[in-house]
Structures are given as structure tokens and as C-alpha cells.
Amino acid sequence: MEHKLATAEKKLLVDLVKLVQKRGLEGENGGWKEFLNVYDKKLGSSLSDPARRSNDVLVAFLLTFKKKEDLQLIARVMQCGANRELIEKFKQETPDKETPEQRLVRLTITHDDYPGNYTFPSYAEDWYVTELGKKKSKVIKSTRMLSIDCEMVTCEDGSQALVRVGAVDRDLKVVLDKFVKPDKPVIDYKTDITGVTAEDLERATLSVADIQKKLRRFLSVGTILVGHGLHNDLQVLRIDHARVIDTSYVFEFVDAPKTQRPSLNNLCKSVLGQEVRMDGAAHNCVHDAAAAMKLVLAAVEKGAATLIQPTEEMMVAEKRRQEARQEAGKAQLFLHKIPHDVPSEELHGVLSGNFTLVVKPPKTGGYSTAVVDFSSPEEANEAFENVEGDVAKDKSGLPQKKAVLKLSSGLAVSLFVRKMVQDDSPCEISTSERARAEENNVSSKRQKTEDETEETKEATVNQREADKTKLFLHKIPHDVPSQELHGVLNGDFTLDVKPPKRKGGYYNAVVDFNSPEEANEAFENVEGDVVKDKTGLPQKMVVFKLSSGSGVSLYVRKMVHDDSPGEISTTKRARTEESNMSSKRQKTEDESEETKEANAKQREADKTKLLLHKIPLNVPSQELKVVITGQFTLEVMPPKRKGRYYNAVVTFNSPEEANKAFEKVKGEAVKEKGGLAQKMVAFKLSSGSGACLYVRKMVQDESEETKEANANHCEDDHLKEMEELKEKLKAMEFAISCEGHSKEIEELKQKLNAKEHQIQAQDKIIANLKMKLEKKQSKSRS
């Protein structure tokens, strides 16, 4: 493990540390921040972002974990990272070097739907992550294949459970055919589809973990897993295997959209000339696994085409499938944008009536979804009507409502309830109709932009009035429990939490009050200075304590501009931005005397200032006054991007006071990349923890500027002299090429060589100086 961690990429190590933080795991020296306080006495936990720490620090922390379950988690994450890296290499492999089997693997992993469907929550304890192997050349040449298929039932909590597994090898020999005992009560055996009955499961004794163990011996390094819609099987098996062939991705109908995938039965009819089963017959997972393997062998060994021309019979069968799906859709509703931390049993409070719920878990901590099945279309429509809220359309034109669900914990979350078919049509809209609807929507949006109607203006006003009752919490660290956010604001409100867009990032929350007055009062009661975000909306930075005792910061922002200045219209804002761009362009093209004068004044003003930057967010602004001596004012600036730092400008009465304060800062002055002098400062907070930041001048010292200008001028002179010598040499060679004056040419060449050696020597001196400077900077940081 130590060697694997030491040779791992930085991104993988950072992901590991963030995952450990998210799960609240602790090694021998405690959690991440406790470890930093022990390991790094100087900076401690003030620099807690793993991405800003060296690989050595990250590895040292991960090696403090000794528990078996923690080591297994680290091993799974490491293996997932290694597999992903190898898959990326597979994508870059040139087709002329690959085997026929690898070609089908490449067609699968480069399919548009592969990233979404084959990203699994495989960090969980009950998942098995296979090892692809270290050597790409060995893996890519392996032609060993195993085809699998699974049958699933619906459990009481809405989840899908594995009940039967079939597997065949490349020779079509059955290597596994077992029933699996579900670990939850079953409410729908789907016998007409799966062929599985309650009696079959009474005799079952194997668990999913047992099936994983039985499959492991077939999943040696380089093995290709085959299946039709294989991601569904891997999801219930809880196996993450990277080298796969999905026949629903490899084989396609001619002129059909990628979203329309041919059924296994139709593929076998077209490619193999035989059916897997008669229409209406139940599935048999062993037969389905064998059928998928036969399709792959036909493409690999017989060169069967992967682009299929559907027959009239197939089109009729596909139409029947679509109609059956549409009929089923009438009795269904779809719940989406469900926050990942909402328990599935709580979703029953969203809808009324009798129904079954099939929940699809989130991929990586984002939103989950659920399909709700009713006994009839009438019951589904009644349940949709009973959901409070206005009916809107999703991007496909399907009716949906935004619902607010109050959890047993007292928190309120929002999600969407959507119909599966259109209201005004007996069936789901076709692909072509949907495309036309989307085209009309785009055209309509364009028309609204060009010519805003009175209705649009009225809707905008209504939305603005609604937004006056809301506040927006953003830049909330992902490890802050949502229930702790109630301590940020006072008053009666509901909290709608939005999960982070990316793994380990920040999340947001919308706070809804009963009236604009209550929202304004809550905002006023938040301690801190009011600043503007980049759109001009008022916001405050809040530092508050969690129940664990640690402190975090976030931002509280209004949803609309204050009424006094009035909200800026889109047109006015566009004109302002256009005017600003034009002004900047004009300044660049032809800087006037007035601009030069303004720049000179700004420079004089900047001489009285120092910049404090890279200030950790957990450092209160009032503690910054211990860093600088003298009389000054402090202007705090919130971070410009998602991150961990903020800045502050310190203004003195004169340049002399600013220089004096900078000189009194302990530490060696170094140059940042813009050439400005700065020092790194480590200091103690009143809480006892340590923090560090940088103190930087706002302008270059006069002497340094002069030196830099002279150096640049000297370099320009050398280059100019070299160019002149080269031109003379060319002219001389051309003029006397026929006269044999080689002596003059040799003299010029010698001068040119001497000048080049002189410049090379100067370059070495400059490189040595830079190296010494970097060493000094690294010493001052450590």
C-alpha cells in the first residue's frame, strides 16, 4: 500500500483525503486537520486544502490509517483510479493496433452514454472493484470474455434487488446459474418478465457478496465482461469492472437516434437469424447471457456488421415496445432532483394514493430519482393533481411540479414530480415531435429575447416579488450538515438545500421567509459588513461555530437588488458591459494623456497601501490587525472564486508609513510573479490555532524598476546587435559569393559566435539567480 500511495497521482491522493474527510474517518493522529496540527507545527490546519499540500503530506496522512475497513476503502479508491487511467489509455489506442475484441470495448467506452451509466458508487463497502492490471499491452491483448445477465425484483423500500444470475464463457459454457436471496421484503417479483417466483427464492441461500466471490475467479486480469445493458447488471451485482462490451451500445439501427437502442431479441433476429425467446415469454438470464456472447462472437469471429438495417417486422416489434412503454408511462410518475441524503421511505410523503416506488441512487453524491407505479392512469393523474404547486414544463415538454417535502428531522427539501407522458396525447411524444417541440422552444426563447412581451415583464415582476422573500446561502463547505444552517439566520423559514455540483465542492441553500420584511430583518441581523457580489447583489460573509466546535464560513446573499437603486435591467446591463468593453479597447489602442495622468495618480495612491492575500477563510478579519503595525484602515474583499482565501487592502496615511510597516513585518522579502515585493507571515489567532498569509506591496520599488528596465534595455541592445551582425553576414555572403572573400565572412561568423556565447553565459547567470531565489522562497515558506 505504501508504494502504491507514494507513486499515485496528486489528483487521486487529493480525492482520497477529501473522501476520508467527508466520511469523518480518523487515523492514528485523528482526522485531517488534527494530523496537520501534529505533522506541520508551523502552518498546522490553517492550510487544510489537500490540493495545496504536497504528495508527501497527503501520503503521510493516508498511511496513518490502520483499520482493516479503512485500508479496504483506500484500496478500492486506488483501484478505481488505476482502472480509469487505463480506460483513458484504451480510448487513445489507434484502431489498427487493436484486436477485434478490443475494438468492441472501445465502441462501448466511447459511447455518449458510457460515462453516465458506468459511473458507480463503488467506494461503498459492499462493492467489489476488479483489477484491470498494470500493463496496458497485456490487458489489451487479452481475449478472455465472460457474459452475464441478472434478474431483479422490486423491494418494499423501492430499491431493485438481485434474485438470479447467469454467466457463460466464450465457449458458451454455463459457469454460473444461481438464485439470490434478497435482503429486503419483496413487493413485486415481476414474474411475467423475470420468470422468478416466490417459491424459487424460498430455496435461495446465497447473498450478493456470495455471488461476487463466485464471479471473482472468472474476472482475472484483462477479462472482458459482456452483456446487453450491462450497467444495470453491474449495479445490482455491486461490481465495478472497467473492461466491458455492452451490445446495446455496439449494435445500432441505421438512421435511428442513439437513444433508441435495439432489443436483445431483435438483435439476435437480425445478426444471428434466431430469437432469444418468443414474444411475451419470460426472460431466462442464462439464455440472455448466451445471446449477448453470440452477438459479440459474430462480430469478432465472423465480422458481422454492427450497424443494422431493421426489417419491417423489427420496426413493428419496436413500435409495440414503445406503445407498451407509453401505456405503462400513463400509470407512472417520475420524481427527480431528489437530494442524495433524503431517505427513500420519506418519499412516500410527497404523493397520495397507493403506489410502489423504485428508487435509483445517485451516481456520485448528487441527486437521486424514483419511478412511482400506480394501478391505473387515473390514480397517477389524481396523485399529480394533489401535489401543491404550479404546473410547468420540463425541457421535453412534459408536465411537472416542484414539491416541497418536510422530512421527519424538521428540514424541508424540494424535488420535482413529473408525468411520464403528455396530457393532451394518448401516448408519449415521438422523438421527431419532441425535436420539433424543442426547436419551437428555442425559437420562442429567441423571440422573447428580441422582443420582450408584456406577459414576460409581468412574470419577471412576479418572480422578483417572490425572490424578495428569500435569501441565498452559498459557498457552504460540503462537510457542513444541513441542519446546522439553521444557526446562521433567525426567524421562521424553510430551507431548500442544493447539493454540490461536483464531488467535494460547496453546496447552496435557498431560505424562504413568509414576507420580504422578515427576509430583510434576518439579513440585517447577520453580523458583518455588506459587500456586493459580481452581479451587484448585497451579501455578507458569516463565520459561525458548528456543534462539533469547529468554525466555518459561508455567504448570505439577497436574491434581488434593494428597491432604492432599483434592479438593473438586462438591456441596461448589456449596454453597460458593451460600453465597458469599448472603453477598455480604446484605452489599449490609444492611451491618452489623461489616462497616463490617472495611472500616475493611482500609482501614487498605491504607494500608501499594502495587500494582505491568501488569507484563510476561517481567519476573522478583526484578527488581521496583529499582522501590521501603525495607523491604517482595513478593507476586506471576499474571495473572487470558489475557494479558501480572501484578501484585504491596508491603507496608510503616507508611502513612508506603508514602507515602514512592510519593513517591520518579520521575514525575508521575495518577489511574486509580477515582480512585487512580498513576505509570508505566520501568526497565532486568539483561538490558539496558527495561520499564515502574505503581505505584499502594491507597487514596485523605484530601484527595482530601474534595474529591471536597464536589464531589459541591455537585453534588447544585445539582440539588436546580433540581428545587425546576421544581416551584415547575409549581405556579405551574397555580395562576394563569387569573389572568394571568405576571410571577411569568417570574421563576421566569429563575432556572431562570440556574441551568442556571451548571451548564453548571461542566461546561465540569470538561471542561477532564479534558482537561488526559488530556494530562498521555499525556505521561507517552510
From Swiss-Prot:
Main location, first listed in the record: nucleus
Coiled coil (UniProt feature): 577-605, 709-779
Catalytic EC class: hydrolase
A molecular function (GO) term: RNA binding
GO CC terms of this entry: mediator complex
InterPro entries reported in the protein's UniProt record: Exonuclease_RNaseT/DNA_pol3, Nucleotide-bd_a/b_plait_sf, RBD_domain_sf, REX1-like_exo, REXO1/3/4-like, RNaseH-like_sf, RNaseH_sf
SUPFAM superfamilies: Ribonuclease H-like, RNA-binding domain, RBD
Keyword vocabulary terms for this entry: Coiled coil, Exonuclease, Hydrolase, Nuclease, Nucleus, Repeat, RNA-binding, Transcription, Transcription regulation
Compositional bias annotation for Basic and acidic residues: 595-605
Domain Exonuclease intervals: 145-296
Domain RRM: 331-410, 469-549, 608-688
EC number: 3.1.-.-
Compartment(s) where it occurs, according to its Swiss-Prot or TrEMBL record: Nucleus
Region (Disordered): 426-464, 563-605
Family membership: Belongs to the REXO1/REXO3 family.
Function noted in UniProt: 3'-5' exonuclease degrading single-stranded small RNAs.
Name of this protein: Small RNA degrading nuclease 3
Organism from which the protein derives: Arabidopsis thaliana (Mouse-ear cress)
Top-level taxonomy: Eukaryota, Viridiplantae, Streptophyta, Embryophyta, Tracheophyta
The gene coding this protein: SDN3
